[in-house]
Amino acid sequence: MSFVLGIDTSNYTTSCALLDTADMSVRSCKKLLPVKQGERGLRQSDAVFHHTKQLPELMKQLFDKRYDLSAVGYSYAPRCAEGSYMPCFLVGENVAQAVSLACGADLEKTSHQVGHILAALYSCGKLDMLSSDKPFAAFHVSGGTTDLLLCEPDKAKLINITQIGGSRD
């Protein structure tokens, strides 16, 4: 029995989860980043600070005992696109790399956007769509943007994403 740790440190939420590969069950912990009343979001430096404080607390909740980790995954950027970068994702990346090295677990990176799509497929019992030849459409609503995405299963990257529509916000 092995487990996969997932970490996401977006500009809104600190998240971590454990996937039990034996039964595909998931335990997760998450905490919103504090935004002062009347403000619309956080500066990246503030998001990094809050993730640095919150992630160890959440990992302590998640790891109620010792787990045999086979892999550690993390979000490295908002999207899998040239120039897609936010410093807040460095916190999750650094923790994921440290845990991976300490446990001898594989290290896997993906985008925040792909993470949302995978979470949606998991929660509706449709992970089998990843092993199909058929493309599918997905809406990604996150961080003040709404995107209509064409998702094509890919053995190497899991999903190739092409934005085919979206909001102008």
Show which residues each predicted segment covers.
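Short acidic/glycine-rich loops and adjacent helix/strand connectors
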Residues: 1-169
